């Protein structure tokens, strides 16, 4: 489905410029299309005209992952509307073709192929799960497409065709485990995740870190099918094992059942400590703050984060999507994707993928809602880890913030 600037919504296009939008507008100035002839800035047949450039948005608008991915769609559309409001990219307005991955990995691959081969989009804001990313990666590498991936993930990957705006394992998993172990003097851990590549690989990394570096013990490890809502058996095992920490990577709609059933079974934060690496404000909308009050999440961004960038960003997001709208870690990382793409294109002076890829590493963004980030040569971002303690109102108090952590997607000893 093609979405023109007008159809992005009058509400979005009339928003005041954010701190991020103003900062980038000042950094790049106002590029005029006449200064960048199409024949020179588009030598590979992308969907670029003298007045427009087309990008793709591909997330799950339906299915079990829609609870998590809707925020990414909203954030990317907001960023694109703001970019258009400051003159677009190389003087061209961005048009969007949006597709629905429908929480189905083959569908993601099929839609990616359509966007790249038929629609000739200049870039795609794509995926949430690692399973969907793994499904589309061969398509992007074959067709030399450009993917901005917003989700925290297991690492152990690096592609010329992907920029990863979420955190990899050493930034989220290892730093989070270090904090919770020290803070709670934890010795025993129970690992639980959804049954696909990200939770399984993440738990493999977590187990190794717990046992070899933290000298702890994993007393249980369980995986549930994506979309599963029956957690009674797992909860009974946890009650029997009595771990110091539940370490969780349950995703999508399963999270709603998981936390509600935990609470109903009496395993609330007063009796059990949990650190999750998969719950953001987006998921809390469905889970209900009362069902995870006092539990912890390890993320680089929380909506409650206090800094001038975020103080400007949150009201604008709510103005676009309503006062009850929330912003989670992946939503904020998704918001960065269009802005980083704009930066790469304008540094390169071209929409050609190879030139954008070469231009973006080293770029420093000081106006992101999360704070300073920098694009590493390995296509990940330098960023901080934060630990949030959930409140009943569905927001989190940030109780820990690390220094900037350099991304290391292939950590020695964890491969």
Q: Model features per residue range: what roles?
A:
Residues 1-54, 415:
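Short, low-complexity disordered leader/linker segments with a strong preference
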Residues 34-42, 46, 53, 361-415:
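Solvent-exposed, acidic/polar segments of extracytosolic/periplasmic ligand-binding ectodomains
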Residues 203-298:
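Extracellular/periplasmic bilobed ligand-binding domains
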Residues 261-335, 346-351, 400-415:
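Extracellular/periplasmic periplasmic-binding protein-like sensory domains
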Residues 36-43, 52-54, 67-74, 82-156, ...:
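Beta-alpha junction/loop-to-helix N-cap segments that form part of ligand/metal-binding clefts
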Residues 40, 108, 165-189, 200-201, ...:
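Hydrophobic alpha-helical segments within soluble ligand-binding/sensing domains
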Residues 115-127, 148-150, 190-193, 242-252, ...:
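Periplasmic-binding protein-like
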Residues 61, 162-226, 245, 322, ...:
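An alpha-beta-alpha
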């Amino acid at each position: 489905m093609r979405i023109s600037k007008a159809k992005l919504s009058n509400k979005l296009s009339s928003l005041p410029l954010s701190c991020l939008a103003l900062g980038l507008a000042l950094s790049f100035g106002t590029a005029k299309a006449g200064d960048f002839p199409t024949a020179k800035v588009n030598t590979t047949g992308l969907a670029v005209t003298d007045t427009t450039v087309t990008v793709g948005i591909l997330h799950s608008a339906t299915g079990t992952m829609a609870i998590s991915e809707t925020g990414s769609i909203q954030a990317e559309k907001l960023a694109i509307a703001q970019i258009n409001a400051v003159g677009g990219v190389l003087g061209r307005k961005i048009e969007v073709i949006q597709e629905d991955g429908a929480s189905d990995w083959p569908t993601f691959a099929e839609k990616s192929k359509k966007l790249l081969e038929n629609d000739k989009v200049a870039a795609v804001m794509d995926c949430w799960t690692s399973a969907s990313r793994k499904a589309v990666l061969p398509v992007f590498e074959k067709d030399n497409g450009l993917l901005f991936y917003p989700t925290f993930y297991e690492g152990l990957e690096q592609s010329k065709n992907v920029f990863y705006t979420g955190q990899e394992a050493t930034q989220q998993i290892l730093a989070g485990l270090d904090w919770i172990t020290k803070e709670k003097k934890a010795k025993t851990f129970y690992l639980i995740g959804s049954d696909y590549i990200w939770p399984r690989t993440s738990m493999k990394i977590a187990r190794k870190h717990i046992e070899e570096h933290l000298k702890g013990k994993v007393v249980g490890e369980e995986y549930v099918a994506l979309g599963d809502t029956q957690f009674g058996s797992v909860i009974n095992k946890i009650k029997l094992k009595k771990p110091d920490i539940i370490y969780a990577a349950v995703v999508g709609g399963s999270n709603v059942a998981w936390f509600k059933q935990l609470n109903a079974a009496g395993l609330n934060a007063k009796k059990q400590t949990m650190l999750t690496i998969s719950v953001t404000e987006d998921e809390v909308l469905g889970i209900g703050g009362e069902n995870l009050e006092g539990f912890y999440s390890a993320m680089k961004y929380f909506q409650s984060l206090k800094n001038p960038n975020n103080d400007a960003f949150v009201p604008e997001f709510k103005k676009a999507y309503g006062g009850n709208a929330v912003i989670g870690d992946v939503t904020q990382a998704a918001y960065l994707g269009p802005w980083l793409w704009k930066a790469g294109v304008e540094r390169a002076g071209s929409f050609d993928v190879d030139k954008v890829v070469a231009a973006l590493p080293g770029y420093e963004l000081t106006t992101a809602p999360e704070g300073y980030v920098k694009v590493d040569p390995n296509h990940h971002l330098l960023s901080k880890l934060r630990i949030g303690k959930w409140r009943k109102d569905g927001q989190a108090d940030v109780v820990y913030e690390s220094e900037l952590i350099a991304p290391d997607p292939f950590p020695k000893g964890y491969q």
